[in-house]
């Protein structure tokens, strides 16, 4: 069964910028952390990736702001798939940041691929990783790519 994975956080002092709201780098950090928490939850820990010599590589992030997140505010980051190639080699993912009152604060759309850390090249992910990723919910605008966008 597909699930939207989510995790709750609290904005910290180190996340703030000069304007007293969460800095853009913090959004990207929380998006990456949520992605890794999902992978960990389906059995792909950091140690698993290291042992198998593979990992995800993000090629592009697109961050869109809707509402500020301020210091000590609680927020949730969810995670879903928005596109992939049929072989699973490349993918597009979306993280949505929502406030405690369910207001959409930001979205991060990320394009990535699976990478062989020894050969230093993109790879088709192993079957068990593809099966784990298949548990992730797909967005309403999900698309399957014949070839990834350039």
List the predicted regions and their residue ranges.
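Catalytic strand-loop segment that frames the active site of acyl-thioester-processing enzymes
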Residues: 1-41, 100, 150
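HotDog/MaoC-like acyl-thioester-processing domains
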Residues: 3-7, 69-74, 82-150
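Hydrophobic residues in beta-strands and at strand termini
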Residues: 9-13, 65, 114
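Alpha-helix boundary/capping residues
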Residues: 34, 42, 136-140
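Hydrophobic beta-strand-centered segment that forms part of the acyl-chain substrate-binding groove
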Residues: 38-84, 88-90, 105
């Amino acid at each position: 069964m597909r699930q939207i994975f989510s995790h709750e956080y609290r904005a910290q002092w180190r996340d703030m910028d000069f304007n007293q709201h969460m800095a853009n780098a913090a959004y990207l950090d929380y998006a990456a952390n949520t992605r890794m928490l999902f992978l960990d939850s389906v059995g792909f820990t950091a140690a698993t990736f290291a042992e198998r010599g593979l990992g995800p590589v993000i090629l592009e992030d697109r961050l869109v702001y809707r509402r500020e997140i301020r210091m000590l505010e609680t927020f949730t980051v969810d995670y879903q798939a928005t596109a992939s190639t049929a072989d699973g080699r490349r993918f597009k993912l979306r993280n949505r940041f929502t406030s405690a009152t369910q207001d959409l604060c930001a979205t991060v759309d990320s394009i990535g691929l699976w990478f062989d850390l020894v050969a230093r090249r993109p790879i088709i992910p192993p079957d068990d990783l593809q099966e784990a990723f298949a548990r992730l919910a797909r967005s309403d605008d999900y698309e399957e790519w014949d070839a990834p966008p350039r």
